């Protein structure tokens, strides 16, 4: 069962599309919307949405409501989200095995107005579904409960 934890977001339409998709996929876990924050070097970084699931691990969502701008900037944002989440999780030794983090971190941007897509930039909800279906957390059974602690 998926538990949805709603915060405040200005991107509710895109968030609802993701929520509807996740509910049809039968994932177990938590979907946090509108308030997950990561600490970065330059201050706090807001994450539009965060999925924590035994099947997928962690998925950080960037919900983009604007038309395509600079792809390099978007990729840099996704890298920054990944790096900050990795740094946060590595503080918890019980999530690693021999210095290797056992929780997969995935980032994607759902940007339906973009014309250009990439591995991490999905321009349709179908692409988001394909991306999520491609994820597998082999150590999920062992580390999922630890992740929620």
Name what the model sees in each region:
Residues 1-47, 51-149:
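Intrinsically disordered, low-complexity Ser/Thr/Pro/Gly-rich regulatory segments
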């Amino acid at each position: 069962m998926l538990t949805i934890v709603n915060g405040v977001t200005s991107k509710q339409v895109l968030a609802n599309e993701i929520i509807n998709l996740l509910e049809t996929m039968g994932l177990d876990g938590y979907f946090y919307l509108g308030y997950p924050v990561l600490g970065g070097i330059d201050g706090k970084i807001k994450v539009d949405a965060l999925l924590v699931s035994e099947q997928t691990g962690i998925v950080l969502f960037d919900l983009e409501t604007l038309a395509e701008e600079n792809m390099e900037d978007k990729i840099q944002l996704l890298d920054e989200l990944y790096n900050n989440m990795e740094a946060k999780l590595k503080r918890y030794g019980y999530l690693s095995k021999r210095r290797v983090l056992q929780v997969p971190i995935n980032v994607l941007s759902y940007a339906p107005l973009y014309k250009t897509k990439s591995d991490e930039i999905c321009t349709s909800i179908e692409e988001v579904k394909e991306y999520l279906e491609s994820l597998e957390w082999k150590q999920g059974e062992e580390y999922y409960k630890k992740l929620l602690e």
